[in-house]
Amino acid sequence: MPYAFCPAFMKMKELLLQPRLQLLADMVPAGSRLADVGTDHGYVPVWLMQRGRIAAAIASDIGAEPLRHAKETAAEYKVSGIDFRLCAGLDAIEPEEVENILIAGMGGETIQTILSDAPWTADGGYLLLLQPMTKVELLRKWLSDNQYHFTEERLVCDKNHLYPVFAVRGGAGTPITLVQQYGGVMLDGDPLYAAYLEERIAKLYKVMAGLKKSLDPENAVKVKNLMDICRLLEEKRGTL
């Protein structure tokens, strides 16, 4: 049966996402209830709700100004059904309100703090979509050590930057190697993996160059450890 023509739909202004946010939106399970923590302009929940991809959304932010922008985005694209909350992390979100949690666009240490402050996220009933901007290796290690297991990891290139996105669940930690901690847990087969490894290696060499300028004798040990990690990443890159 052909679809009926709907003039109202044709006039609807559609939100378009940049590649990083598009990947995050694509990884959200259909029909679920989502909490977007640190929502900023609210682009991901608005995009998902506009297309009927999710049942409900909570958009939270620690800042009043970003939350105001998120409300304006929803109004601009005529999207309802999003609950906007001013709070730090998951402080104002109850476990029974959501099935999926998106935390993106912030440092890995901040994401770690948010999850540490909400231990209920580790019980296995929630899919966490995480996109750290910094300290990626620290977040991978913390997740592994704190009973979260990786179900998916993907890379996306946005404005000449490579970003990793993890999908994790609580319940049983995934033991990871140094190569996985620094280079990715589930990226074998990703077309961007070789470029990502090269980027990670270059950043480690930059850190080592800075450490070598210091007279602190402890830095010599740090440099040796980082050099060992670089060798492992280079070996991995050579297998791709």
Region roles according to the model:
Residues K11-L17, D91-A92, E109-L240:
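Class I S-adenosyl-L-methionine
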Residues V98-G105:
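Short SAM/SAH-binding signature in class I
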Residues G31-D40:
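Conserved class I S-adenosyl-L-methionine
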Residues M10-S32, V46, R68-P95:
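S-adenosyl-L-methionine
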